[in-house]
């Protein structure tokens, strides 16, 4: 069983959270835990999603990866939350998987969690400093750092995560079948 810590915070993007979590739920060897150090309930940016299965205390050594949704909340809340940033940095420092989408990679770059030498995808936010190595690709895999550009890439991002994280490309077909009800056609 692989365990993924899911960092949640106010105004995270609904689509980025739900699409990725749905794909994770397809894979029986993945277990997710939603975490925030103090909040018990989170409402996402569009008010569509409310997360209330949040734990406030964790043992980081129990997790194999961390997933951080993006959205406006990344720049408004995550950017200023030293406890969450420290939690995310634990995964980087310990060479564990880190999955981030939209503005979250920009925030992680700002705080030095993503370095100037790493290639990553993110939302092209003109209000944030971005690395020269920022990619315009929808999804980027750079060793154990997997990033995506925006909510529109969330399903592809989630599929790349499960295939890369579990080192099993056949999961691509399983995810596609669960999402679209059919085999992948050329």
UniProtKB/Swiss-Prot annotation:
<dbReference type="InterPro" id="IPR029062">
    <property type="entry name" value="Class_I_gatase-like"/>
</dbReference>
<protein>
    <recommendedName>
        <fullName>Uncharacterized protein MG029</fullName>
    </recommendedName>
</protein>
<dbReference type="InterPro" id="IPR050325">
    <property type="entry name" value="Prot/Nucl_acid_deglycase"/>
</dbReference>
<dbReference type="Pfam" id="PF01965">
    <property type="entry name" value="DJ-1_PfpI"/>
</dbReference>
<dbReference type="InterPro" id="IPR002818">
    <property type="entry name" value="DJ-1/PfpI"/>
</dbReference>
<dbReference type="GO" id="GO:0005737">
    <property type="term" value="C:cytoplasm"/>
</dbReference>
């Amino acid at each position: 069983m692989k365990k993924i810590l899911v960092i949640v915070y106010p105004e995270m993007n609904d689509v980025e959270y739900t699409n990725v979590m749905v794909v994770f739920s397809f894979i029986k060897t993945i277990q997710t835990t939603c975490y925030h150090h103090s909040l018990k309930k989170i409402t996402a940016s569009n008010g569509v999603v409310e997360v209330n299965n949040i734990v406030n205390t964790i043992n980081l050594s129990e997790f194999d990866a961390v997933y951080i949704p993006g959205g406006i909340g990344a720049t408004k809340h995550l950017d200023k939350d030293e406890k969450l940033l420290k939690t995310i940095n634990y995964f980087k420092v310990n060479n564990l998987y880190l999955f981030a989408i939209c503005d979250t990679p920009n925030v992680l770059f700002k705080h030095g969690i993503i370095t100037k030498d790493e290639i990553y995808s993110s939302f092209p936010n003109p209000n944030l400093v971005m690395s020269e190595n920022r990619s315009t690709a929808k999804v980027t895999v750079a060793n154990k750092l997997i990033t995506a550009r925006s909510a529109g890439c969330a399903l592809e991002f989630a599929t790349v995560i499960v295939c890369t994280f579990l080192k099993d490309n056949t999961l691509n077909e399983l995810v596609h079948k669960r999402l679209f009800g059919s085999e992948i056609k050329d």
